[in-house]
A protein has these predicted regions:
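Short S/T/G/P-rich N-terminal loop/turn motif that feeds into the first structured element of a domain
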Residues: 1-72, 78-95
């Protein structure tokens, strides 16, 4: 089992816009165990999308499927306009 966290550093004041995009897209992705997190302390304007995947092949399939769906593309349209930078963390669950 893997936990994948996509960490987005939003442009100042734009985290809410990014949250709105993901909140619109999440219901379209049924069967995906995912969470949407925001900073409480630390770096301002940080949004984290956390996804649980059985293995890395399943995660790669999720990315491919998500990227090919027009409804998800429409929901996420323009979200990169609100992003300054980002990175991905991948963790293997051991207990």
């Amino acid at each position: 089992m893997f936990i994948v966290r996509n960490v987005f550093r939003c442009k100042p004041g734009k985290a809410k816009n990014v949250l709105d995009k993901f909140k619109a897209a999440f219901p379209l992705m049924e069967g995906v165990k995912q969470r949407l997190l925001v900073d409480e302390v630390g770096g301002f304007w940080t949004v984290v999308v956390e996804v649980e995947a059985e293995d890395m092949a399943a995660f790669e399939k999720l990315l491919k499927d998500r990227g090919s769906r027009q409804d998800v593309q429409d929901a996420m349209s323009g979200y990169m306009d609100f992003i300054e930078s980002g990175y991905r963390e991948i963790y293997r669950v051991v207990a």
